[in-house]
A protein has these predicted regions:
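PLP-dependent enzyme catalytic core of the Aspartate aminotransferase-like
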Residues: 3, 8, 18-35, 39, ...
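N-terminal "arm"/small-domain region of PLP-dependent enzymes with the aminotransferase-like
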Residues: 3-128
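Conserved PLP-binding catalytic core of the aspartate aminotransferase-like
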Residues: 69-74, 79-80, 109, 294-306, ...
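Active-site phosphate-binding strand-loop segment of PLP-dependent enzymes
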Residues: 105, 202-230
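Conserved N-terminal alpha-helix of the aminotransferase class I/II PLP-enzyme fold
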Residues: 117-164
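Conserved PLP-anchoring active-site segment centered on the Schiff-base-forming lysine
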Residues: 172-191
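Short, structured coil segments at secondary-structure junctions
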Residues: 179, 199-201, 313
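Active-site C-terminal subdomain of aminotransferase-like
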Residues: 228-322, 328, 334
Length: 404
């Protein structure tokens, strides 16, 4: 038998040749790696022994950090109000029967008996929930009827319904606008739009509030940088202020709506609108079609309230005269926002005790961009009478003069 063995001198020559052909950097790196592995393998860690007495001492001295900031006992958010009735034209707040100027019910449809009966009938048929998102067993026939009705009412091709008004616009914006796109936005847009802009990661240019000239300036500057593109039309709105339901919708061309059904986060991943609310919205739209004069009734009430409330002694009225939402600011601008907030909170509380339900407008001052001054929010309702508006004015005027 013949054995073939590697000659030792030849082996050493091969190793030397490898080192000669390898750069100094590689040799140093591999040497450092080898030393590190050897240190990890052979290094002995100092064992730490724990005793029961030591564990008890650690447990006794342990002071966990607060999960959230400590609340100030005097904070206005801790002084909640208890509602004991349906929130309609009148409402019971903390056992005070009040004329409601606080909540959004512009057309007064929350108290419509026919809409209530239709909602109750829908509960008996479908129950109170829809059991999932629209793409996962959450679509009922009433959802499709509502979308068809909305498209017809708005005179567009198609519509898509969301289960929550806030998620409507905050989902619609990132569905169409991505990184690299440009959006021009009013600097005073609401928080839902702000969240949609953040989610889109687009380049955002803010123009001055309600200043069309400033918007035109930004568009002209952008036109110099870009070629003209086709117009895309999308209308988004919430149903929570007018039609006596909850949710929101987007309407536009069929192409626009279909894209949102695939890309709208609130549509794809949130539970769909409860069928009873979809039925309520359908009934409200039928009412709006059959009685268009209720819009004119609301318009007249809004103008009347604007005319009356603009004469407060120590409060300044803000908002368009045709808008059903009014804001009352302290006439003398205080430098401290907290002081204004506390004073207006006292005004609201005293007005409730005298039979007028009003609230402060709420903002997330640490999160929202360009937050507005503290104010009292007043909402119009077409069911209000001239006597009730005069009575509300007198109470608010008396209370503001006493506190401010």
């Amino acid at each position: 038998m013949v054995y073939k063995m590697v000659v030792t001198p030849y082996l050493f020559k091969e190793i030397i040749a490898i080192f000669q052909n390898t750069s100094d950097y590689i040799i140093a790196l591999e040497t450092l790696l080898l030393l590190s592995v050897m240190w990890i393998i052979f290094h002995k860690r100092d064992g730490r022994s724990f005793y029961i007495s030591g564990d008890k001492e650690i447990t006794v001295n342990y002071e966990p950090e607060n999960l959230m900031d400590i609340a100030v006992p005097q904070h206005s958010f801790l002084k909640t109000h208890l509602i004991r009735s349906k929130v309609g034209k009148n409402v019971s707040v903390d056992d005070y029967y009040c004329l409601n100027l606080a909540t959004h019910n512009y057309l007064g449809l929350l108290e419509d008996k026919q809409i209530l009966e239709n909602a109750c009938r829908c509960i008996r048929k479908y129950g109170v929930g829809s059991c999932g998102p629209r793409g996962f067993y959450g679509t009922m026939d009433v959802h499709l009827k509502l979308e068809e009705r909305l498209a017809s009412f708005m005179k567009v091709e198609d519509s898509v319904v969301y289960s929550y008004g806030f998620s409507t616009i905050s989902s619609a914006i990132p569905a169409y606008s991505k990184r690299g796109d440009i959006i021009f936005v009013d600097e005073a847009v609401n928080f839902a739009i702000q969240k949609g802009l953040d989610a889109s990661r687009s380049t955002v240019y803010f123009y001055k509030h309600n200043d069309i000239a400033d918007l035109e300036r930004l568009l002209r500057e952008q036109a110099k940088r870009d070629d003209k593109r086709a117009e895309i039309d999308l209308i988004a709105a919430a149903m929570e202020w007018t039609v006596g339901a909850i949710g929101g919708f987007c309407v536009g061309s069929h192409f626009i709506v279909e894209h949102q059904r695939l890309s709208g986060l609130g549509y794809c991943f949130s539970a769909s609108l409860p069928p009873l609310l979809a039925e309520s919205a359908i009934s409200s739209l039928k009412r709006l079609d059959s009685e268009p004069q209720i819009f004119m009734e609301l318009r007249e009430i809004s103008i009347l309230m604007n005319s009356k409330f603009s004469t407060f002694s120590k409060l300044k009225l803000g908002g368009n005269k045709l808008s059903p939402v009014k804001h009352l600011y302290i006439s003398e601008n205080r430098d401290n926002r907290e002081v204004e907030h506390e004073l207006l909170n006292k005004v609201c509380g005293e007005c409730i005790s005298r039979g007028i339900a009003i609230v402060q407008a709420c903002y997330l001052y640490k999160i929202e961009g360009n937050p507005i001054r503290p104010s009292i929010r007043i909402t119009a309702n077409r069911l209000l009478t001239v006597f009730e508006i005069d009575y509300a004015f007198k109470i608010i005027e008396d209370v503001s003069n006493e506190i401010l």
